[in-house]
């Protein structure tokens, strides 16, 4: 973005007091010739427009930046309706340089000073049109980011640092192949947000900061993530998400998706944004207890803050000074992730943490694993009513809030294959009666007096 504005300033076309001739895009009546102006602009600064968004060799150009450049050019000549003329010129410019799409290149990283080819471990100083150019330079001689590594050692358990390294590297290229989002969880005050500052230094405007809740609820929010490498929620809300479909789709999407911008026709676009969140608790769903919701998450638990630690108020700035070295560190994580076929390094600590999170959000998981209430046995069967009765009894005796009967039965149907049980809507209950139930499960407690 800064490079675009610097270039446009260097090519400023507004007439000065010393100039006598009007530029070629001013017609004989003194009006701006929109076609001629756009041709001039594209000749001095080549651009492409995809889905109403402008890009140059350095990546995305915001409408605000383009508007400022146009105003600087035409303000000497347009004395009425300046804002409308700027809007018309921007619209015309987008039409003239419109293309269907640019290739999504996940085999290379567009650094500020050139192109790095991942598979070849090769850098060239040449630039090409791209959707994502990082503001940080590729410098193989950059010093080791010692402050950053010390910060991570104080923040995370040693075995979890490779996970963060791989995920941060994952955000350097436009792909969702790993199909994961990362949550960094703590009690507050540990310094998690400094990770976001470092990522901003490396990714620049290729990173958006917004909330996961907004992404899930606001139908325009997914379109805001088009062309972005990372969406960061630096203060996750603890309230459970009522709908997780959009979130799950964004994390895993590998094809086009319907996107909508306010006041615009919806369109089919590609998203490759990754999601990272910082919070005091895990991401929870109000209704979604599917394996898919939890399978897409990695949750890293930070260390407790050392009560004797003296916070360095300038640490964020010091970490940013190491951006080139941190970029190499991220690149190392990306190479490892690719070698492992986009499977993240997950410590036993994090695996247990994720299992605990899932069980705490869905107490049916703990009920399945409980002893003395139910037993999985292919020779047995039980009605859904009796299974739910055993579940309610387990909740009462473990101070858990039972799910509603309908919610329980729906989830049990979804879990049946994993549990190795078979649904039967006409289970023989004796005395000529039939009821819904399952083969392969035995209820071990008396539910008659506790549940009707």
Predicted feature residues:
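Trp- and S/T/G-rich repeat-edge/linker motifs of beta-rich repeat architectures
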Residues: 57, 61-74
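Feature primarily recognizes SF3-like P-loop helicase cores of small DNA viruses
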Residues: 2-4, 8-50, 76-452
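Short polybasic amphipathic segments
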Residues: 52-59, 115
């Amino acid at each position: 973005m800064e490079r675009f504005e610097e270039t446009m300033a260097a090519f400023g076309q507004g007439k000065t007091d010393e100039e006598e001739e009007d530029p070629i895009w001013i017609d004989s009546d003194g009006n701006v010739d929109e076609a001629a102006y756009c041709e001039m602009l594209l000749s001095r600064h080549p651009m492409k427009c995809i889905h109403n968004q402008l890009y140059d060799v350095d990546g995305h150009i915001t409408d605000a930046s383009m508007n400022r450049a146009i105003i600087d050019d035409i303000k000497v000549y347009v004395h009425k309706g300046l804002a409308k003329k700027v809007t018309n010129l921007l619209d015309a410019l987008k039409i003239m340089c419109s293309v269907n799409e640019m290739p999504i290149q996940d085999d290379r990283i567009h650094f500020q000073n050139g192109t790095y080819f991942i598979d070849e471990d090769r850098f060239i100083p040449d630039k090409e049109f791209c959707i994502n150019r990082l503001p940080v330079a590729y410098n193989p001689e950059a010093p080791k980011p010692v402050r950053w590594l010390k910060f991570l050692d104080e923040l995370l358990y040693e075995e979890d640092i490779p996970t963060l390294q791989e995920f941060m590297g994952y955000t350097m290229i436009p792909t969702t192949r790993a199909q994961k989002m990362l949550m960094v969880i703590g009690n507050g005050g540990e310094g998690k947000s400094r990770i976001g500052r470092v990522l901003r230094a490396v990714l620049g405007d290729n990173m958006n900061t917004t909330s996961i809740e907004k992404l899930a609820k606001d139908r325009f929010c997914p379109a805001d993530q088009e062309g972005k490498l990372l969406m960061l929620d630096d203060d996750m809300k603890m309230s459970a998400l009522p709908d997780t479909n959009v979130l799950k789709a964004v994390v895993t999407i590998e094809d086009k998706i319907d996107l909508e911008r306010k006041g615009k026709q919806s369109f089919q676009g590609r998203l490759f944004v990754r999601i990272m969140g910082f919070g005091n608790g895990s991401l929870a769903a109000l209704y979604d207890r599917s394996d898919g919701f939890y399978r897409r998450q990695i949750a890293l638990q930070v260390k407790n803050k050392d009560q004797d630690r003296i916070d360095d108020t300038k640490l964020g700035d010091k970490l940013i000074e190491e951006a080139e070295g941190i970029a190499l560190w991220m690149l190392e994580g990306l190479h490892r992730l690719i070698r492992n076929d986009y499977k993240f390094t997950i410590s036993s600590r994090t695996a247990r943490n994720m299992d605990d999170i899932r069980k705490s959000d869905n107490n049916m998981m703990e009920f399945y694993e409980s002893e003395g209430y139910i037993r999985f046995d292919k020779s047995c069967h039980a009605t859904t009513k009796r299974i739910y009765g055993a579940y309610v009894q387990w909740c009462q005796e473990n101070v858990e809030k039972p799910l509603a009967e309908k919610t329980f039965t729906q989830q049990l149907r979804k879990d049946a294959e994993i549990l190795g049980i078979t649904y039967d809507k006409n289970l023989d209950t004796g005395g000529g009666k039939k009821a819904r139930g399952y083969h392969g499960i035995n209820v071990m407690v008396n539910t008659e007096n506790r549940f009707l």
